[in-house]
């Protein structure tokens, strides 16, 4: 999973989130209100800025377009942007409005009050022109566009129409985090990501179970002229109602559950969803696969306090723990099951690695090779010789451990995601079916001699050799045991 070459243009309401932490120990003598004694403060990018921050922390590049004022908040916001190398500052400064700033006052991690410093004036024609020019300058560099609409004025109907028009001309998908009740303003977008409350309000009907979510989505899809709808459903996960495509007359429906966890803060979870969705789709994944990745990403950030982001390592770890990772089950899978896993993993943009062997008596050399292989890929498949295959290769006294035992031990390793058996002397047939992205063997081989290497390379993959741990072998262990008896 590598987003380093993916660029996303993010336009919307950029703001600064400030947090004032303290304690409440008394009531004011001036009025019946608590007195908050401030002990610490911090600030971070908010709104569309948080969307861009999520993209950057996942390894992508965000082109951030929005309006800021000529004030101290703008200076603080620019300072934050300078600290995030993955964000390109394409903000427009306006003398007609303040930089949006939301300040939260907290005691014992509970909000006491929030203040909003913002303008309620509609976007001026001159501001719209500057925003449109900035978008036109950068849009062709990007693989996706995000409209982060917080309803604060930047995304006026004129700006939305202009941006979507430019994107469609360039064949660039557009993702919308909506705030408006009328989704017709987003006509031409690729995917809109309302939560169920926003979806219900836009469709003017309930959206509290799968059937009603689908019905509501059909209504707003007509308003938005065929945009797909990704409905976020809190603890129920997500539902993607995908617009009809070539070869399909009706919508396609995909669901993914949320993994049970302790939720600390849902602030900014929607920003993470749309950032990951757009980034994953721009990198080549289908909308369904991008939804599954964004669902995992949202699961990470809601377990953190405050407006949070995540990095690729955290996302990989969450995929490992979630149902979509489909890790090993403690025994060998059939070739058909392994092929299905590989297909799903590749749809998620994961790099699939492969190695093989007898693994008769698991030793430090085996574990070292498997651990190193797993660091070079996102998922590792280990193909294991059956007992008959081992006997043909090693002699009638082998294997020491039976096939099921060997597979169970391997499947119990954290570095191994799938174990599959093969009856032949080589794993060529397995490799030809699975077509892994990486084929790993010990450095005692030459690349040109690795079985299946030509098949993997022809499919665009690589053969990689891994250094062995000296003096470690099953044969050596067997000989040592024989001297003791």
Curated annotation (Swiss-Prot):
Family under the similarity heading: In the N-terminal section; belongs to the carbohydrate kinase PfkB family. In the C-terminal section; belongs to the cytidylyltransferase family.
Binding residue positions for ATP: 195-198
Function: Catalyzes the ADP transfer from ATP to D-glycero-beta-D-manno-heptose 1-phosphate, yielding ADP-D-glycero-beta-D-manno-heptose.
Domain of life: Bacteria
GO biological process assignments: ADP-L-glycero-beta-D-manno-heptose biosynthetic process
Source organism: Granulibacter bethesdensis (strain ATCC BAA-1260 / CGDNIH1)
GO CC list: cytosol
UniProt entry keywords in alphabetical sequence: ATP-binding, Carbohydrate metabolism, Kinase, Multifunctional enzyme, Nucleotide-binding, Nucleotidyltransferase, Transferase
Reaction equation(s) it catalyzes: D-glycero-beta-D-manno-heptose 7-phosphate + ATP = D-glycero-beta-D-manno-heptose 1,7-bisphosphate + ADP + H(+); D-glycero-beta-D-manno-heptose 1-phosphate + ATP + H(+) = ADP-D-glycero-beta-D-manno-heptose + diphosphate
Region entry Ribokinase, spans: 1-326
Molecular function GO terms recorded: ATP binding; heptose 7-phosphate kinase activity; heptose-1-phosphate adenylyltransferase activity; phosphotransferase activity, alcohol group as acceptor
Residue segments, region Cytidylyltransferase: 354-485
InterPro entries: Bifunc_HldE, Carboh/pur_kinase_PfkB_CS, Cyt_trans-like, PfkB_dom, RfaE_dom_I, RfaE_dom_II, Ribokinase-like, Rossmann-like_a/b/a_fold
Gene name in the database record: hldE
Complex and partners: Homodimer.
Location of the active site: 271
E.C. number: 2.7.1.167, 2.7.7.70
Pathway assignment: Nucleotide-sugar biosynthesis; ADP-L-glycero-beta-D-manno-heptose biosynthesis; ADP-L-glycero-beta-D-manno-heptose from D-glycero-beta-D-manno-heptose 7-phosphate: step 1/4; Nucleotide-sugar biosynthesis; ADP-L-glycero-beta-D-manno-heptose biosynthesis; ADP-L-glycero-beta-D-manno-heptose from D-glycero-beta-D-manno-heptose 7-phosphate: step 3/4
This protein's name: Bifunctional protein HldE
Enzyme class, spelled out: transferase
